[in-house]
């Protein structure tokens, strides 16, 4: 997400016409497993169950994703095949909170920034892709943050 945010900023500031942004995770199995084991974040059952009542931790995996980004006007003018647009992007952290005990405050700051930049309300969005690591505390805080965002938008539930 951070790479996408930086790429968007470069495009909006006219410092670049095309940006490639993305990331990969190819953890060194021994060190990554040891680190997450020390944090007690690994699933004891070896299965990640995001947003589930039986979630007990995460499972380390590998992945990669990259995006070619242009300003919409430039992509249209070039006849590019446009798969998606980024209307708003937000980034925040919990300012010193424990890695395994996230707080809603930082998550809400990021979501509010993205919605504000896009000029949208939460009910304008059809799909939310959650972080959802499968850690009971992290997933619960993420759901709490989303609930609060919608409550602000629609009033008490």
Q: Where in this protein do the model-derived segments appear?
A:
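Condensing-enzyme catalytic core of the thiolase-fold
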Residues: 1-157
């Amino acid at each position: 997400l951070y790479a996408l945010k930086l790429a968007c900023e470069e495009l909006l500031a006219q410092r670049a016409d095309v940006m490639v942004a993305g990331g990969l995770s190819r953890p060194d199995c021994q060190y990554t497993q040891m680190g997450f084991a020390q944090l007690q974040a690994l699933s004891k059952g070896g299965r990640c169950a995001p947003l589930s009542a039986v979630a007990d931790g995460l499972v380390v995996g590998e992945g990669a994703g990259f995006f070619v980004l242009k300003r919409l006007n430039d992509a249209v003018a070039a006849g590019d095949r446009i798969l998606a647009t980024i209307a708003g992007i937000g980034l925040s952290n919990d300012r010193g909170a424990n890695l395994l005990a996230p707080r809603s405050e930082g998550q809400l700051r990021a979501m509010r920034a993205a919605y504000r930049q896009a000029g949208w309300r939460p009910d304008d969005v059809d799909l939310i892709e959650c972080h959802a690591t499968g850690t009971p505390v992290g997933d619960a805080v993420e759901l709490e943050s989303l609930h609060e965002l919608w409550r602000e938008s629609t009033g008490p539930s």
